[in-house]
Amino acid sequence: MHSIYAVLALALMPLVAAQPARAQNDPTIHMVTYIDVAPAAKDQAAALLKPLAEASRKDAGNLLFQILQRTAPAHQFVILATWKDQQSLDAHDAAAHNKQFRSQVEPHLIAPIDDRLCIPTFVAAQISREVLASLGDSSIYVVTHVDVPGNVRDKILPALEALAEQSRKEAGNLRFDVSYQKTRTNHFTVMENWKDQSANDTHELAAHTRAFRGVLTPITGALYDQRWYKAM
């Protein structure tokens, strides 16, 4: 079985060149925010998150602000935000609507809000807000935290790039982006959006997906943390 994964991984390596890495002078940043509330408070949290999203999308420099609710357990949420630059994010952090949300949701939290500032690494053109708004309830999101020891970071980078490039070519894929965490550069967030669960299921069985897992599993520093979400 290991030999199969090795062959698949080697087959994908020439594909890395097609999608360029982030330009050094590109100031765009991603913020991935995990919010876990008490199970009984999931509806209250959702009610607080919706106005936060509406206000934040109007912030200067905001390019994307998505609120996602985990399919199971449903009391876990994630915010996927893209900002033009650090200054825009700083202004959002200081904004009244952001501070109000954090104050109001605090009594419902079962863990501190987990903000992860990320640097776009392998990204494609962003889908428009109009297209996102038109997606039906069948659309599925996947957010995966990939953690490897620092001394093998360079080994996982080409595997992540190949995975992203091949996955974007799949039927039903709407987004497949990879970012690394600014403070821990060996931690990555993979952000996916699929037309429906069937498209995602097909992706999970694809040769390039299995090849990536074959590269990652022997070197990972943690369990494979993959979560499915629906847009609110």
Residue ranges and their predicted role:
Residues M1-H2:
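N-terminal secretory signal peptides that target proteins for export/translocation
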Residues Y5-A17:
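Bacterial N-terminal signal peptides
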Residues A21-T28, Q66-P73, F101-I140, R175-N186, ...:
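Glycine-rich beta-strand-turn "strand-cap" elements at beta-sheet edges
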Residues P27-L63, W83:
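N-terminal targeting signals for Sec/Tat export/insertion, comprising classic cleavable signal peptides
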Residues T28-D36, Q66-D93, S138-D147, D177-E204:
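Short, well-ordered beta-strand segments in beta-rich or mixed alpha/beta enzyme
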Residues K42-A46, D90-D93, R153-L157, H203:
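Solvent-exposed, non-transmembrane alpha-helical starts
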Residues E54-L64, T82-L117, Q166-L174, N193-R227:
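An amphipathic, aromatic/His-enriched active-site/gating alpha helix that lines ligand/cofactor pockets
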Residues L132-R175:
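Surface-exposed interaction/gating patches
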